[in-house]
Amino acid sequence: MSELVGIARFKIHEGKLEEFKRLSAEAMEIVRTRDTGTLQYDTYFNDDQSECVIVERYKDSESAIGHAEHLGDISAAVLAIVSVVHGELLGEPSEELRANLAGIEVPQLFTPYQLM
């Protein structure tokens, strides 16, 4: 069982900021009420709110899979109004999570080299 960290950076399409904020609030409510293994789910904006970074931390791969399942419809709606600048998953994912990520470009997986 290994903690995982996800980092995603999005560029919000012109005129879609309020829709993004609405969807983000819906996602936060789902995370707070349904995700039992999500340890962190934070959204940060740049100064003009044209881009955001989302930092997610999960207690294990099963929690990350559950999070993705809970946010499925909202994630699809968000991806329709943003461009993905980059995304990383940091940690040692299970074989099931690796299989779920196979064949997609984002997030890019980084496994530990040195940890404190």
PLM regions: where:
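A short, acidic, amphipathic alpha-helical segment used as a generic capping/interface helix at domain edges
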Residues: 72-76
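Short S/T/G/P-rich N-terminal loop/turn motif that feeds into the first structured element of a domain
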Residues: 1-52, 59-70, 80-116
